[in-house]
From Swiss-Prot:
Organism of origin: Sodalis glossinidius (strain morsitans)
Name of the molecule in the record: Pantothenate kinase
Entries under InterPro entries matching the protein: P-loop_NTPase, PanK, PRK/URK
Annotated Gene3D superfamilies: P-loop containing nucleotide triphosphate hydrolases
Gene Ontology CC terms: cytoplasm
Top-level enzyme category: transferase
Annotated family: Belongs to the prokaryotic pantothenate kinase family.
Gene giving rise to this polypeptide: coaA
GO MF assignments: ATP binding; pantothenate kinase activity
Primary localisation category: cytoplasm
Domain of life: Bacteria
Pfam families on file: PRK
Amino acid sequence: MIKAVQSPPTPYLQFSRKQWAALRNSVPLTLTEAEIVNLKGINEDLSLEEVAEIYLPLSRLLNFYISSNLRRQAVLEQFLGTDGQRIPYIIGIAGSVAVGKSTTARVLQALLSRWPEHRTVELVTTDGFLHPNSVLKQRDLMKKKGFPESYDIRSLVNFVSKVKSGTPRVTAPVYSHLIYDVVPDEQKVISQPDILILEGLNVLQSGSDYNHDPHHVFVSDFVDFSIYVDAPETLLQSWYINRFLKFRQGAFSDPDSYFHHYSQLSEQEAVAIASQLWSEINGRNLQQNILPTRERASLILGKSANHAVERVRLRK
């Protein structure tokens, strides 16, 4: 039996990396080194050790929660005398820009789909529900992209509601980081998966975050289990700048890239612009709209240098 680190009363159980890793409990690692390379983000050093010590215990925990949810559904069907319909289990992943949400989402998708039950696991990012650039420009919101007011929150809530209601076929808009915009006439089809992983800055936000567009139902109302990927802001800013520099040498060099003009910058100029973008946009959004949602999460992954998770907090 693994005991959590003793601390003052808190809604969370707290684990060191070593304690959390021990909860893997012989779950086999089904990903190869080559597959892990394909899953990691541009700015991360995702290792087999990280997957084994952090994500395998998490996938085991999620498997328990999902199995419990299925048993609850079976009890309800028995009570009602119905066969019922497949209701997807929704996992939400939130956190700052550059913290590694996408990598966490992709690793969990790969691991959860390989459990013996062979569950169907879909992944959708909330980026697709940003208003198109044409709308953001019209509303003078291009410099607030990722802030609550930049999302078509009603469409996002409608999408998640349909998925959670068991609608056989639901579509989600697709976002391209190359063109920095929603892709016109392109959609991702979601057809009653066993699990939907929803990843985005705004997954845990609620009414107080949308004063500009008051409504009564939010994405978080439909999420069964939520994860917040956390790190000190000094690290987040550093990771953001490093990622910007890598994009400058890679994706930004594509003539079709929205940020192609940044590819001509010197390293010093690129660092200055990335620092400015962080302080004016991403850092502000973190402090005002993202970090305040952290304590709403079911589980918090606390990262240190090199994107390594060093502590885990699990809601009691």
